[in-house]
Amino acid sequence: MTKGILGKKVGMTQIFTEAGEFIPVTVIEATPNVVLQVKTVETDGYEAVQVGFDDKREVLSNKPAKGHVAKANTAPKRFIREFKNIEGLEVGSEITVDIFEAGDIVDVTGTSKGKGFQGVIKRHGQSRGPMAHGSRYHRRPGSMGPVAPNRVFKNKHLAGRMGGNRVTIQNLEIVQVIPEKNVILIKGNVPGAKKSLITIKSAVKTAK
């Protein structure tokens, strides 16, 4: 069965094990998620659990949103997401960080930091040309392709807006769970800026 929770990225820090091993960790604050809806094949065509995270003021919500969360007897939520393959939850129940424990392997999804308009070297990792005085080719994108099509094909690696994409990092290890503070410590870095939404789910591809 899949386990999942929504949280907010706080930042990175470091901890030391009893053996003195240094571990860099990302701090995720995951206040209790509220189950807003349980979808079934009969009514919705598929099975999923819809959860809400991070309360917001009622004045910022419209009537349909208020009516939706009222069924769960909770405040309007800033983020609403769905998890599949989760069983045993009812509308109004809470999902807390203690569903995970140290040593669990998870997949973490977030929105990568936006970098703005960038060239092909930074955006796609291409190599630059000679930087000598006589060279005319420094940081340009290179060949646009053969002559015959008389056009540039789609998906050609060119300069453009970089970042701001949905990114998932698989098979990260949970180092520590602190239920009294609603905090999860995950080994390594996770995508996204501070205060951004983070989704933590059970790993799809477990290490063999």
UniProtKB/Swiss-Prot annotation:
GO terms for biological process: translation. Residues 124-146 are annotated as: Disordered. Belongs to the universal ribosomal protein uL3 family. This is Large ribosomal subunit protein uL3. It comes from the Bacteria. InterPro entries: Ribosomal_uL3 (IPR000597), Ribosomal_uL3_bac/org-type (IPR019927), Ribosomal_uL3_CS (IPR019926), Transl_B-barrel_sf (IPR009000). One of the primary rRNA binding proteins, it binds directly near the 3'-end of the 23S rRNA, where it nucleates assembly of the 50S subunit. Keywords: Ribonucleoprotein, Ribosomal protein, RNA-binding, rRNA-binding. It comes from Streptococcus thermophilus (strain ATCC BAA-491 / LMD-9). One of its GO terms (cellular component) is cytosolic large ribosomal subunit. Part of the 50S ribosomal subunit. Forms a cluster with proteins L14 and L19. One of its GO terms (molecular function) is rRNA binding.
